[in-house]
Amino acid sequence: MQKVVKLNNIKIGNDLPFVLITGPCQIEGKDHALFMAEKLVKLTSKLEIPFIYKSSFDKANRTSVHGIRGVGIEKGLEILSKVKSEFDCPIVTDVHSESQCTETAEVADILQIPAFLCRQTDLLQAAAKTGKIVKVKKGQFLAPWDMKNVQTKLEAFGVKDILFTERGACFGYNNLVSDMRSLAIMAELNVPVVFDATHSVQQPGGLGGSTGGERKYVELLAKAATSVGIAGIYMEVHQDPDNAPSDGPCMMKLDNLESILIKLKKYDKITKEK
């Protein structure tokens, strides 16, 4: 029987209807966060899709020293707390160091470990100590079966609820490719698997001083992943992605999200029919 992670009234499992994890790449301010959250809550309620709000207080791995990193942990958590209380939605955000875990866990329901840091034992242990759900993004440099080692670490540290996320694998320079087999391979570890449809179309460092991306393939990859049978879709959105401070070339336009989700629900239903 596949593992099911429970978060409030949401059940996350590979055999269950998919959960949507979405929001803007980084927190841009209180007004913007509340605007995005309101739109997303209304849309997911209308479509009856379980929803978890995601946004980052710090983009610590920007390509360039001049890249906009975000509002910082103190202001960021304050804004996420406001989103959580105003819209009664769960929160996931990423942590980049052991020192951030305890403070972040006061607001976030899920701690996300970035792909570049997925093997950092001390960070995994610090996240584990919070007692929160730990969501790990598979490194672009890792084989899917190597996530077993990450799982073993987290379980050794006492984590009961683990989520894994596929976000593409390095394919030469400045390019990623999505191997849909990895979703099934990680699911065999009895861990709910999420597909990151927007970061999977990244072209890391592809613009020289920043990361490029191919937004036009987000829907295609999301359909393919949903057809495999997964626990969740992770998809960053923005009302004006071309002018967003980070990951603009990858993020979906908010106005296009509804039509994509309607299609994904159909794929998901067919795949999971008994």
Curated annotation (Swiss-Prot):
Keyword Cytoplasm: yes
Pfam families linked: DAHP_synth_1
Pathway: Carbohydrate biosynthesis; 3-deoxy-D-manno-octulosonate biosynthesis; 3-deoxy-D-manno-octulosonate from D-ribulose 5-phosphate: step 2/3; Bacterial outer membrane biogenesis; lipopolysaccharide biosynthesis
Subcellular location: Cytoplasm
A GO term for molecular function: 3-deoxy-8-phosphooctulonate synthase activity
UniProt xrefs under SUPFAM superfamilies: Aldolase (SSF51569)
Catalytic activity: D-arabinose 5-phosphate + phosphoenolpyruvate + H2O = 3-deoxy-alpha-D-manno-2-octulosonate-8-phosphate + phosphate
Assigned keywords, A-Z: Cytoplasm, Lipopolysaccharide biosynthesis, Transferase
UniProt-listed Enzyme Commission number(s): 2.5.1.55
InterPro entries: Aldolase_TIM (IPR013785), DAHP1/KDSA (IPR006218), KDO8P_synthase (IPR006269)
Keyword Transferase: yes
Stretches of the chain forming a coiled coil according to its record: none
Predominant cellular place of this UniProt entry's protein: cytoplasm
GO CC term (a single one): cytoplasm
Gene Ontology biological process terms in this record: keto-3-deoxy-D-manno-octulosonic acid biosynthetic process
Domain of life: Bacteria
NCBIfam families referenced in this protein's UniProt entry, alphabetically: KDO8P_synth (TIGR01362), PRK05198.1 (NF003543)
Family note: Belongs to the KdsA family.
The protein, known as: 2-dehydro-3-deoxyphosphooctonate aldolase
Organism field: Rickettsia conorii (strain ATCC VR-613 / Malish 7)
Gene: kdsA
